[in-house]
Amino acid sequence: MEGVNAKKQKHFVLVHGAGHGAWCWYKLKPLLESSGHKVTAIDLLASGINTKRLDEVDTLRDYSLPLLELMAAIPPDEKVILVGHSFGGFSTAIAMEHYPEKISIAVFIASVMPDAVHPPSYFFNLVFEWSPKDEDPLDTKIEPYGNPDQPRTAIRYGPKYLSSKIYQNCTTEEIELANLLLRPIYLFAEDLSKAKAFSAKGYGSVKRAYIVCSEDKSFPVGFQHWLVENVGVIEAKEIKDADHMAMISKPQRLRQCLQEIADKVV
């Protein structure tokens, strides 16, 4: 952008959560760009407008391939601020493991955030341990897909679940946008169960920050605080009145948090 100090300009790479796509950053992206930053929002495989079908994606690494290809193309002298939301924290961690030298800091928003000690499945299981045991799934559906001999199950959020658990602080129009654009979710539980811990040399060498969403009814707020305290970050922030989708319900505040993190640590 003309007139922007090149030293202050940052490159933010935005990684969406399960079922979502690059579209979910539609409010935040122009806000960061209006501040002079470069912003790249990606679609992971079988997400957003990516043309892959869910039954064509076997592993979490496959699912994360668009992000890994983007990171591979980043020039050696450039570093990005990697921003992962929700389940996108796993893809963010994979990118950190493979390209630590290209990331100035990774920011996790209401997201799973592994460490360099435990396997990823440890944190995957903790999400369910922290979640209410008697939670009503409402109109969420579990659907089989793929090979009939070895079927997998996908999750499809219904309008009631979206509006009351994930987008409860968003407008009717924003919720309808999600209803129209969300795609089925596969959580790669079997793949995660076989994965080894991320390394201290790769993932563990990248600075981390965390942004808690204070009214999150989807990803337990208590678990978000637990991750901050037990996994460790160099900066933690909390967005008041934010539901799980802070980039939609509180985009200005999220932009401010990201700017403050970038200014402080980059």
Swiss-Prot record:
Single GO MF descriptor: methyl salicylate esterase activity
InterPro entries, per database record: AB_hydrolase_1, AB_hydrolase_fold, MES/HNL
Expression sites by tissue: Mainly expressed in roots.
Active site: S86, D216, H244
Residues covered by the AB hydrolase-1 domain: 11-121
Pfam family, one: Abhydrolase_6
Keyword field: Alkaloid metabolism, Hydrolase, Serine esterase
Pathway(s) where this gene product acts: Alkaloid biosynthesis
Subunit relationships: Homodimer.
Similarity comment: family membership: Belongs to the AB hydrolase superfamily.
Stated name of the protein: Norfluorocurarine synthase 1
Organism: Strychnos nux-vomica (Poison nut)
